[in-house]
Amino acid sequence: MSQDTEVDMKEVELNELEPEKQPMNAASEAAVAMAVAGGAEKNGLVKIKVAEDEAEAAAKFTGLSKEELLKVAGSPGWVRTRWALLLLFWLGWIGMLAGAVVIIVRAPRCRELPVQRWWHKGALYRVGDLQAFQARDSGDLAGLKGHLDYLSTLKVKGLVLGPIHKNQEDDVAGTNLQEINPAVGSKEEFDSFLQSAKKKSIRVILDLTPNYLGQNSWFLPTQVDLVATKVKDALNFWLQAGVDGFQVRDVGNLTNAALHLAEWRNITKSFSEDRLLIAGTESSDLHQILSLLESTKDLLLTSSYLSASGVSGENMKFLVTQYLNATDSHWCSWSLSQAGLLTSFVPAQLLRLYQLLLFTLPGTPVFSYGDEIGLQAAALPGEPAKAPVMLWDESSLPSASVSANMTVKGQDEDSGSLLSLFRRLSDQRGKERSLLHGDFHALSTGSNLFSYVRHWDQNERFLVVLNFGDESLSARLGASSLPAGASLPARADLLLSTHPGREEGTSLALEHLNLEPHEGLLLHFPYVA
């Protein structure tokens, strides 16, 4: 064995004995020291690599220095690359800007929205007899306030109330248009009701037909000047009280009606553009109706025009298109009479069809209380035809022969009821621009079919198809003579049907559109440029 080997062996033995001489806590200190040194322990030996680690570290790339980086960045290749990227960036930015300008310039212009008053945005709801509407012995303003929540669910925009003023039958002196009938309530109760209605976003229109309890609604022709003065004073009084509009009925019996209507409309308009005047007439003659409308373009007129002749699709198309063409730019109102119920003029099987019709024609639909549930005018024997008791629940039923599903409560729980249809149509009428103020185009379909398109600018289009007949019919609505902006597609989606059995959302081919008897369809399709 060589001398060097002997020395190494001695060092190994000393290293093996060294841990035995160390205290117990020295082991951890040694481990820490070895970890710091980067070595590993095996059988008491510590392997330390110093020179090799430093050489490896020196060989690793640490990046370019500032001077080296500037030198490389200034080389011709990198300079050309930077200029190319900068040029591409600005060319791309200018291209996107030019594209945006072209899109804006070539995009079709949006039509300017027409001026919309509150009565343009939804239906009006008439309550002429408070006691009959509430179906209780005490039909007063306080009780009517409790039904405002129900009116809110119908999404009507205005309540046509009364007449509720003091009227001594056929006695001008005993009639006070500024005083509320004590049986209905007091001025304070009316003010409270008015405030509650405004909180529900329901406008109140007061009926000021003077002699509503007498033989002639406007007294004698010789008293017309006195009555007209009373009406003018009443308009100013109730406008100051916060009423949103007025209705006067039977204006066909009023001497110089057009002259007085123009004067009364000037009073309401001078107070505020947001005040409404409604005139009612039982006339169905278009010439008489137009003579009344000529007095002022801001007048709503309810009449018996739509109920004048037999029920058929062809006849309804003629009446509607004739009326719209004759009134031109005048805002229309749609009803079947100035005060009566739908059931007084329409068979029960057509009630749903007429609801769809009135809600989708261009203008303001006007309904009487009970129209939403199909209330019959002869619900109670002996009651006046225009004052049937409203059927709220089973307690309102006049007899056991009347079904509970004719009540508000019964229909409220049925998604396929007439009441549910009324609410859905009222909701659609109030939120779709094409139904609010869109253009109207009637289509040629058949003798018992009436169909038309409602459209506005680039908004959703609506197609209404009504079958007034007693038999199933097939409508062919493919090609039509409509303007380009209102042309029909090959298919349209079903929004709702007056017959609950239809599956909503179904895409229907317009070339072969089958309808059941007395069925109405409301379809929609998107605007295509």
Curated annotation (Swiss-Prot):
Membrane side Cytoplasmic: residue ranges: 1-84
Cross-link (Glycyl lysine isopeptide (Lys-Gly) (interchain with G-Cter in ubiquitin)): K49
Modifications made to the protein after synthesis: Phosphorylation on Ser-307 or Ser-309 and on Ser-426 by ecto-protein kinases favors heterotypic cell-cell interactions. N-glycosylated; N-glycosylation is crucial for trafficking and stability of SLC3A2 to the plasma membrane.
Sites of Phosphothreonine modification: T5
A biological process term (GO) from this entry: L-alanine import across plasma membrane
Extracellular topological segments: 106-529
Glycan attachment positions: N266, N325, N405
Phosphoserine found at: S2, S65, S307, S309, S426
GO molecular function, a single term: protein heterodimerization activity
Coarse class of the protein's main subcellular location: membrane
Membrane-spanning residues: 85-105
Covalent cross-link Glycyl lysine isopeptide (Lys-Gly) (interchain with G-Cter in SUMO2) as placed by the record, residue numbers: K66
Membrane topology annotation: Single-pass type II membrane protein
A GO term from the CC aspect: apical plasma membrane
Regions of compositional bias (Basic and acidic residues) in chain numbering: 7-20
Keyword list, A-Z: Amino-acid transport, Cell junction, Cell membrane, Disulfide bond, Glycoprotein, Isopeptide bond, Lysosome, Membrane, Phosphoprotein, Signal-anchor, Transmembrane, Transmembrane helix, Transport, Ubl conjugation
Residue span of region Disordered: 1-20
InterPro entries documented for this protein: Glyco_hydro_13_cat_dom (IPR006047), Glyco_hydro_b (IPR013780), Glycoside_hydrolase_SF (IPR017853), SLC3A2 (IPR042280), SLC3A2_N (IPR031984)
Subcellular localization(s) per the UniProt record: Apical cell membrane; Cell membrane; Cell junction; Lysosome membrane
SMART domains documented for this protein: Aamy (SM00642)
Sequence similarity: Belongs to the SLC3A transporter family.
Assembly behavior: Disulfide-linked heterodimer with a non-glycosylated light chain (SLC7A5, SLC7A6, SLC7A7, SLC7A8, SLC7A10 or SLC7A11). Interacts with TLCD3A/CT120 and ICAM1. Constitutively and specifically associates with beta-1 integrins (alpha-2/beta-1, alpha-3/beta-1, alpha-5/beta-1 and alpha-6/beta-1), but minimally with alpha-4/beta-1. Interacts with LAPTM4B; recruits SLC3A2 and SLC7A5 to lysosomes to promote leucine uptake into these organelles and is required for mTORC1 activation.
The protein's role, per its UniProt record: Acts as a chaperone that facilitates biogenesis and trafficking of functional transporters heterodimers to the plasma membrane. Forms heterodimer with SLC7 family transporters (SLC7A5, SLC7A6, SLC7A7, SLC7A8, SLC7A10 and SLC7A11), a group of amino-acid antiporters. Heterodimers function as amino acids exchangers, the specificity of the substrate depending on the SLC7A subunit. Heterodimers formed by SLC3A2/SLC7A6 or SLC3A2/SLC7A7 mediate the uptake of dibasic amino acids.
UniProt name for this protein: Amino acid transporter heavy chain SLC3A2
Source taxonomy: Eukaryota, Metazoa, Chordata, Craniata, Vertebrata
